[in-house]
């Protein structure tokens, strides 16, 4: 989606057949419409949670993006972890946090939420009207955690608007050279630089 995330009307994209994520197996290819329907399926679960801070980790890029976008739409503070290991998470976890992942330690398992109706046609399974009028705030809080040189979680706090400006700068510098290009990245989506290229 080559637009600012904070300007995206997800509801209007519910029927889009444009490619969103292309998997090399051709089995798990996702359209923008698939993505919006999965957000609509997960949104009620996130919105109903009392915790204001969601600790997020998933090695699966698609699950990661569903968690991330849905948490922001539900007005949650998003903390992006670079590992799902409990020994790491326990140092940053508190009573107002929820660990969301596809791992066994997760308090809310995203894989189960997405697989609850695998055989139902997309348009029949989910009513996307729950997303009508919802947008992601440009002032949304996003916190990255990196181990740095100490091995202990170190917090890097950003507003969504800061990240969007970084993406706009990258686009302004390189867009003509990279338009219609295929990117291969060695940096995972749960690290700040990989996040900028994969997610935003």
Question: What kind of region is each of these model predictions?
Answer:
Residues 56, 174-200:
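Conserved AMP-binding loop of ANL adenylate-forming enzymes
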Residues 20, 32, 54-59, 64-68, ...:
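Short beta-strand->loop structural element characteristic of the AMP-binding/adenylate-forming
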Residues 54, 71, 146-149, 183, ...:
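Conserved S/T- and glycine-rich ATP-binding loop of Class I adenylate-forming
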């Amino acid at each position: 989606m080559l637009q600012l995330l904070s300007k995206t009307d997800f509801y209007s994209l519910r029927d889009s057949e444009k490619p969103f994520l292309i998997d090399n197996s051709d089995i798990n290819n996702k359209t923008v419409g698939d993505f919006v329907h999965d957000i609509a399926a997960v949104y009620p679960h996130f919105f109903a949670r009392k915790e204001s801070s969601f600790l997020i980790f998933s090695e699966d890029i698609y699950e990661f993006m569903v968690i991330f976008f849905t948490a922001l739409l539900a007005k949650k503070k998003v903390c992006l972890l670079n590992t799902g290991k409990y020994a790491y998470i326990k140092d940053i976890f508190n009573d107002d946090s929820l660990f969301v992942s596809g791992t066994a330690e997760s308090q809310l398992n995203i894989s189960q939420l997405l697989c609850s109706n695998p055989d139902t046609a997309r348009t029949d399974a989910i009513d996307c009207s729950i997303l009508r009028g919802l947008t992601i705030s440009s002032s949304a809080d996003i916190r990255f955690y990196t181990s740095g040189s100490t091995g202990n979680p170190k917090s890097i706090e950003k507003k969504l608007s800061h990240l969007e400006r970084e993406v706009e700068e990258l686009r302004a510098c390189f867009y003509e050279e990279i338009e219609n290009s295929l990117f291969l990245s060695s940096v995972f989506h749960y690290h700040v630089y990989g996040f900028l290229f994969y997610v935003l």
